[in-house]
């Protein structure tokens, strides 16, 4: 089973059973020591796309929003290193829908919604994501660049993943400031089925 390391803010890392290492929205915290096989960037804001933080294995690939959302209304699936990545909607007033994506990952037999920066989307309202019966999903809830905790909780109910994780809880400018990587009060207020709270540095076996 894959292991997830939450690095803080919107950054996290997966290590699969075969050692494949995947970074999602690299920027914050620590844990960039393992060479990357795959780097996922949900959008090009500075706090999600520092792809030079980690060493890379030969053949490392970077999948960006445009790779799975190449045109309006078009979302597609790509595969790399045995991991399937499917683009889904991500947007709000600070994140244009045609520049941002969420990514549904399939790795080591589990499904995981890497939501990116977003508020409630039509993919959530329509039941499209609920129909996937996801194992895990993360939801940003800073209430400034993204939705607040109440809306994130509602989104979690609509998506219906077996486990939901609040992330991106504080507006950030310093990736090394622990106070900007996590907000315990917001995490506690997040209300979702199978809620899991991860602090920076925590690991989760999927």
Predicted regions mapped to residue ranges:
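Core dinuclear metal-dependent hydrolase active-site scaffold
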Residues: 1-34, 38, 67-132, 147, ...
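Di-metal (Zn2+ and/or Mg2+/Mn2+) metal-binding site signature of metallo-dependent hydrolases
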Residues: 28-67
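A short helix-to-beta-strand connector/capping loop
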Residues: 1, 58-59, 81-83, 190-194
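A short helix->loop->beta-strand "cap" motif at the edges of active sites that frequently abuts
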Residues: 20, 57-63, 160-163, 191-193
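Short, charged/polar "capping" segments at the starts of alpha-helices
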Residues: 46-50, 68-71, 172-178
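Cap/insert and terminal regions of metallo-dependent hydrolase folds
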Residues: 122-203
């Amino acid at each position: 089973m894959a292991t997830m390391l939450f690095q803080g803010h919107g950054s996290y890392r997966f290590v699969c059973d075969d050692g494949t290492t995947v970074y999602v929205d690299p920027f914050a915290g620590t844990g960039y020591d393992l060479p990357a096989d795959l780097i996922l960037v949900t959008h090009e804001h500075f706090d999600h796309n520092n792809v030079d933080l980690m060493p890379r294995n030969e053949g490392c690939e970077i999948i960006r929003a445009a790779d799975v959302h190449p045109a309006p209304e078009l979302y597609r699936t790509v595969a790399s290193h045995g991991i399937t990545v499917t683009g889904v909607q991500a947007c709000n007033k600070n994140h244009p829908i045609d520049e941002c994506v969420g990514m549904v990952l399939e790795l080591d037999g589990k499904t995981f919604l890497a939501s990116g920066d977003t508020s409630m989307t039509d993919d959530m309202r329509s039941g499209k994501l609920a129909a996937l019966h996801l194992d895990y999903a993360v939801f940003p809830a800073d209430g400034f660049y993204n939705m607040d905790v109440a809306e994130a909780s509602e989104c979690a109910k609509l998506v219906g993943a077996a486990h939901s994780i609040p992330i991106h809880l504080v507006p950030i400018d310093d990736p090394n400031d622990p106070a900007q990587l996590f907000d315990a009060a917001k995490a506690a207020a997040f209300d979702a089925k199978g809620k899991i709270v991860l602090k920076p540095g925590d690991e989760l076996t999927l």
